[in-house]
């Protein structure tokens, strides 16, 4: 587990009563000091795994997985950017279900190839004239939108819109690559994941910067801010999203 949101932290306490739990302490600031702390937490986690499974996790092995992960991130980014086409080639619900499903794949060595094959098919069919027609283009931001929260996406698309972009944690937010040229693999991982624009960060300018760019990239007509009950920090940031959308993007 990790200490991103308060709801998770309390849940891990209860989970630890009947399951082995290791919690990574996540600094809530994107500073050099925060990165240093998070780097140490990643090393501590590595040591816990080594002890638990009686193995040695080498830096070469980590580099290999960083490379594989970057390929997956690039493939997911490419898939979601097909929705920048206007009119959109597919419903947002179809795209988010594909993205959401990749998180449950156990065989990750071929995952990037599988996602790219789906994107190739969508692009080929679009070139032949297949699309969903002109609809209001909606961006969903805020809390993760998998599981029961997908009812919001269904409501939008059942009423004539299309969700062309998911800025949130289950969409575009975590897709920046890990720096493979960084000689320190733990520093590379810490910088990649601590610099995600999550609302648990204070301050959190990266979320608004990403949102600003995605509104333009996906030719967005409207923004829906999804806030789950346990995500109070996203609730607070709603005012910042409203200000960006209404005052800057117009």
Residue spans for each PLM region:
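Trp/Phe/Arg-rich N-terminal binding region typifying the photolyase-homology
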Residues: 1-59, 165, 169-170, 174-250
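A charged, amphipathic alpha-helical module
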Residues: 39, 43, 47-163, 167-175, ...
